[in-house]
Amino acid sequence: MKNSIAKTLTHGEQVRFYFVDNTQLLQEIFELNNKIPLSLKLLLGKTVSVMSILSGTLKGNQRMSLQITLSNPKYKIFAEAEANGNVRGYLNERLLTAPGLEEQSMEDLIGSTAMISVIKGSDMSQFTSITDMPNQNIVDDIANYFVQSDQTPTYLHSTIQFDDQASLLSSHALFAQLLPGAPPQLLSEVKNAIKTNPEIFSKLKAEEASDNEEELRRMFGSAKVIGYSSSQFFCGCTKEMFYGMLYSLSEEEIKRSIEEDEDIEAFCHICGKTYTFQQKEIEHLL
């Protein structure tokens, strides 16, 4: 299922303002990670939610890859967004199996020395940026990346609601960025409007933004819907991608698998899909 991103210009067309209800996207990802504690759901959910809205800022065949290294450098979060709206994200195995997760908050896990690494661009041209996380907050520190790396004042907001059993109820995200020449204070006006109307984006449907321009104008003084894009979970894994894993096995391991008539299984850590390599496929490796 696709989640629609509404793209608007506000404040006299000086601010680009996007918003999305990405509940379905996060639901799909949480179903693949249904046993993780709430702190990890928040880490993964906030990261993917922000990448979902940022997919709407990409063009052509652009891609944005994000790696968050927490204060314990063994713990990492990965996410990727493409211009076509495909989004994926996961936590590394060391973080998933870290001790004491039930007792730690999202802020505790991020810590004071976490780092964000971003690779952005197309196949022909990419650049890498690394920024710190002074806010110990996924959303604010990804916004800080735009300020540090692109010198572009940016505001990001993500709201994720869970029930008493830590099951997802809803998820919304928004993105606001000043266009060249816009007064810096406009971003503060956007933040204040959101704080004053915290429920607005749980009521407005992004795909119906054109019918709600009046409500947006009430919040921002002026608003114009300029388009839509989609955002959806997409892993993109294939069986062929895992052949490299087979070639990394030793000759002894391959022979043992053949002698014991055992298939070899490869597990995708992003979507959870399992690929089985049968005896005929394994024999070709020798």
Q: Which ranges hold each PLM region?
A:
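Interaction interfaces in information-processing and related assembly proteins
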Residues: 1-225
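Cys/His-clustered metal-coordination modules, chiefly Zn-binding fingers
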Residues: 195-286
